[in-house]
Amino acid sequence: MASQPKSQPRNEIPSVATPSPRTLEYLRLSMVVFALADVAAHLFASPGATPIVSYWIDIETATYGLIAVVYLLGLRRYYLPPILFTAYNLVMYFVSGLVALPFGISKAPLVGHLQFAQYSFGRGFSLLPWLYLLIMGIVLLKKDPGSKLNELLDR
């Protein structure tokens, strides 16, 4: 009597270290949603909250629109610039609460917690998308192989 080969137990629980392609697609889509949430926060910010309309806000909204496209298409080779830009925005947000920055983010340093909280609906509401884009951007940079479009760009 021949012994039957024992089947290996299947690991049904997906590993966090290697996300499935479907999980990566959902992560990329969530990055798109948060990038567009950042754009919406700036576009619909109340005009009275920021005393000056600057080119920086325009640059920021356009850039996050482009960042949404990068993550939507899974262009892994371009994941690092959005991470750096988001980190820069976070730093400038907190620095602008203490120091008057020359390029239109704030005319004067903010004093007190209430003024900092009311600094700008757009800038304040952007904090959550920035944190998400920064943290998950680093995760995707390490775990996401990118889409098939990357192979096309390599040719």
Residue locations for each model-derived region?
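Membrane-interface extramembranous regions
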Residues: A2-R155
